[in-house]
């Protein structure tokens, strides 16, 4: 048994500490991954602060994991050493609960999440169950693929399951870590893409990402601007402000929908009568399965979609985490482990 470097949290609220651990061996139905890159996601706060039910310490965070299979456990026949794989938020499912029996694995009542249910990707090696694995296409580098396994799949999956059709007005509220990918996906899917953010200085970036229209929410009324475009079939809310989401609702067209993928502690206030009379709705969307991740990666490779990233070595995980948490990192932060 060899040794590996890992970054762990030993107690709720504790620092990220670089340690040496024994390399684990894969059990039945598992693979051992040589981790090449792991994205840092805001949801890693759940691990750092001990906010997940049943979370055991010490724990290695990380659920945007890219690497190469180093070994397979007993009974694993579909995967082989040397394959490039990714593991996202969907880290396994039971296959027995009602959502699983209906094929809705992301809502498994006993679902597993890397970095929460078991040790994640802030490490040189990691174990994962085979149902959590996604194939990674060659055109994507390790660093590019990592954020697509959470921020990417969440926005891609929400858009493709929204009911919006090519040519319809789709607005992306916020163009940060999630939103800058959402704008790219929406444009490549053929929607009349509208990017909404604060400040006129963000318009060049929005247009570069593929937006046809830009709304400066600090200077314009979002609802009025969207209505002038005919009303949005979909508003994908990637921001963490319930007030901003509420302010955008008036810009929905008939049968329009607001899908929330950004988490806010503020409530979203819905004007009931206009929603009834216009058949409008509000919905949440929670990531997706490993096959959804694989679809996201394939679509990104095919269409040239790439995340904008900042790279840090594993040894600087604490610094990288705080850069993400403080908002100093504009888009996505990725740890390079190999």
Model-identified regions with their sequence ranges:
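Short N-terminal strand-loop motif that marks the start
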Residues: 1-66, 128, 336-338
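Glycine-rich beta-strand-centered segment in the early N-terminal region that forms part
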Residues: 24-38, 51-98, 135-143
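Rossmann-fold dehydrogenase core element
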Residues: 257-259, 270-310
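NAD(P)H dinucleotide-binding glycine-rich loop of Rossmann-like/cofactor-binding domains
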Residues: 78, 92-173
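N-terminal Rossmann-fold NAD(P) dinucleotide-binding loop
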Residues: 179-180
């Amino acid at each position: 048994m060899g040794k590996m470097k890992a970054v762990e949290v030993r107690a709720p609220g504790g620092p990220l500490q670089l340690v040496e651990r024994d390399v684990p061996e894969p059990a039945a139905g598992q693979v051992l991954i040589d981790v090449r890159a792991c994205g840092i996601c805001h949801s890693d706060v759940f691990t750092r602060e001990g906010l997940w039910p049943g979370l055991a310490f010490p724990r290695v965070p990380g659920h945007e994991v890219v690497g190469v299979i180093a070994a397979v456990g007993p009974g694993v026949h579909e995967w082989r050493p040397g394959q490039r794989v990714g593991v996202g938020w969907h880290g396994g499912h039971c296959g027995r609960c009602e959502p699983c029996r209906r094929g809705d694995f992301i809502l498994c009542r006993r679902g597993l999440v890397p970095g929460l249910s078991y040790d994640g990707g802030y490490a040189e090696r990691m174990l994962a169950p085979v149902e959590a694995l996604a194939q990674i296409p060659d055109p994507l580098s390790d660093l590019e693929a990592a954020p697509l396994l959470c921020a990417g799949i969440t926005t891609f999956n929400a858009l493709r399951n929204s009911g919006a059709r090519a040519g319809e007005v789709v607005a992306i509220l916020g163009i940060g870590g999630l939103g800058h990918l959402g704008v790219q996906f929406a444009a490549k899917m053929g929607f009349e893409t509208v990017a909404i953010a604060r400040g006129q200085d963000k318009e060049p970036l929005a247009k570069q990402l593929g937006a046809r229209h830009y709304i400066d929410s600090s200077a314009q009324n979002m609802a009025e601007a969207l209505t002038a475009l005919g009303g949005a079939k979909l508003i994908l809310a990637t921001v963490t402000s319930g007030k901003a989401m509420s302010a955008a609702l008036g810009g929905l067209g008939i049968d329009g929908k607001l899908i929330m993928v950004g988490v806010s502690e503020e409530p979203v206030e819905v004007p009931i009568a206009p929603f009834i009379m216009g058949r409008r709705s509000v919905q949440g969307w929670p990531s997706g399965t490993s096959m959804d991740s694989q679809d996201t990666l394939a679509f990104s490779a095919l269409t040239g979609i790439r995340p904008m990233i900042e790279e840090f070595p594993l040894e600087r995980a604490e610094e990288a985490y705080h850069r993400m948490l403080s908002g100093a990192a504009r888009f996505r932060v990725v740890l390079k482990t190999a």
